[in-house]
Amino acid sequence: MVPISDSIVKQSIDFYGEDLESTVCMEECAELIQAISKQKRCKSDKEHLTEEIADVLICIKLLQSIYDISDGHIADWIISKQARMLERIKGE
């Protein structure tokens, strides 16, 4: 995956402000939800879905910066959540 530029993230937050960027991130998540819904209804537009995923990935970095959340902290949660997923899969 292409790395997301911390410098551009910082510039964007400095320019637009934390409040607006947080709101935009909520909107981008909603747009991804809508794109997934359309994909499920067999209205295949993989390019649009991919674009919305990219937007949300950028937003994750924005939110990490705004709320001071490290990659390591997220990694810890990912490990925990995937272990729980595996337990559920094996339990069924």
Where are these regions (language model features)?
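Flexible "arm" and connector segments at domain edges
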Residues: 1-53, 57-92
